[in-house]
Amino acid sequence: MDEKGRLPDAVVIEHPAHAGGHLGVSNLSDMHDPRFEFLRVLEELDAVFTSLGLRREDVPLIVAGGINSHEAVRELLSAGASGVQLGTPFAVTEEGDAHPNFKRVLAEATPDDIVEFVSVTGLPARAVKTPWLMRYLRHETKIREKIGALKHTCPTALECLSVCGWRDGVEKFGHFCIDTRLAAALRGDVANGLFFRGREALPFGTAIRSVHDLIELLLTGATRPAVAGRWAFSLG
């Protein structure tokens, strides 16, 4: 509730052990802390809402991170969530406007292909082990020692972050231009891009399916055969 007494439109509860991209924890070691488990958080929020004189339905609670099946959706809704939020499964749908290589990298990634690291924002992040990212992580310690405390001019002049480890010389943060790396991923540049991804398997495995098929699977559990002649492929 803000100073004017207004309630938030919704609250998103992200599980850092499963979600992709930037994660809501201070340290990499905190990702698997039991306090982030969805069922525990939803239960504890009941007590918080009661102490504030609120009902559960007053503020929608949306859970995010690793949700990849109809069964998972049902379990979370039954536990009191108002809805679910998915990122990676929608990013690899037919309708997604990213390069096919972007979708391939996300769809074919196995658990061993995914890594957690500290981003230029200072937050832990999760992404696929692409050639550039692994090269950066191999030299991360040396980079911090040599240039970590040095300030740099934003290479894109976009100033996309209020605080940036590379631009502002924050030694403990990551040191690279995140806008450049994300743009490379969107273009399908596998060698040089940063491909954020959640940790869990995707609903259709390595197959690229439509948004309609994905929503139908999540809501009903039904899996339709891929439509012949429609742009779709499998990497498995």
Task: Locate the predicted segments by residue.
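Glycine-enriched alpha-helix->loop->beta-strand junction motifs that scaffold or abut catalytic
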Residues: 4-10, 79-84
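Catalytic beta/alpha-barrel core
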Residues: 12-14
